[in-house]
Amino acid sequence: MTAACWTSEELDQIGSADELRIAPVRGGRTVGRSVPIWVVRVGENLYIRSWRGASGAWFRAARASRAAHVCAGGVERDVEVLDAEERASDAVDAAYRQKYGRYPTYVEPMVSPVARATTLRLIPRPPHAQRA
């Protein structure tokens, strides 16, 4: 599939939102229950992590299907869910600390090796590929 790009407006809106709601696709095309998670922007990319590590239910479902529906900052999009490249990890850690540093009890687990291993990149699906 050819991925679309986030618009500057989408990046700004999602990147500045405190939470993103993610609903992983389950069983092919059924969108599951949405859950609130943290999201960070690094350059032109959006990243998410599982606070519970690889055992998080939303993480397992999103990683298995590689697809989800997200909503944050007034933006709703169907997305591809890809494993982030290891080289992005330090920048993603820094983005979590900068954005969520006011929650030190929660941000430290988000930059731990357990959560870091669950870093996913969100790629918007082209409009013609959006769910019907």
What spans do the regions from the language model cover?
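Short secondary-structure boundary/capping segments
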Residues: 11-12, 38, 110-112
